[in-house]
């Protein structure tokens, strides 16, 4: 499991450097177990640009960087370990609004956003798809 998360962080670095195949990056995200902070009975997310972003982290160090600025202070951050595929295939469609996945958002030069488009989320909820999500452009 840890190896899979490390592989995703490596693919993100390669992509940010201009290399790697974007499809391979999406595949690695889908196979990776991400740590997603839990708050108020749900997964921690932010809204930006008309999109709700579920925040996931590749390891506890990346989650800790996030918690320094957004955590509950003196309490540990609770999180769920979720497969990337489950996030984009099940959780995103259940939100009922344009939503994507933001990975390692507190890591300088190491974050990656997986937007609500065909090939990342199901076509029915993708903002560029032909389903119900097509009318919900951000």
List each model region and its residues:
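An interfacial alpha-helical scaffold signature
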Residues: 1-138
């Amino acid at each position: 499991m840890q190896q899979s998360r490390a592989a995703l962080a490596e693919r993100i670095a390669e992509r940010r450097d201009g290399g790697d195949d974007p499809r391979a990056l999406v595949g690695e995200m889908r196979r990776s177990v991400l740590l997603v902070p839990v708050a108020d009975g749900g997964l921690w997310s932010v809204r930006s640009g008309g999109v709700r972003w579920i925040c996931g982290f590749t390891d506890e160090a990346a989650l800790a960087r996030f918690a320094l600025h957004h955590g509950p202070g003196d309490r540990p951050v609770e999180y769920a370990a979720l497969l990337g595929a489950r996030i984009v295939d099940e959780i995103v469609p259940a939100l009922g609004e344009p939503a994507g996945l933001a990975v390692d958002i507190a890591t300088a030069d190491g974050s990656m956003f997986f937007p609500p488009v065909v090939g990342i989320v199901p076509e029915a909820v993708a903002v560029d798809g032909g389903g119900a999500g097509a009318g919900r452009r951000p």
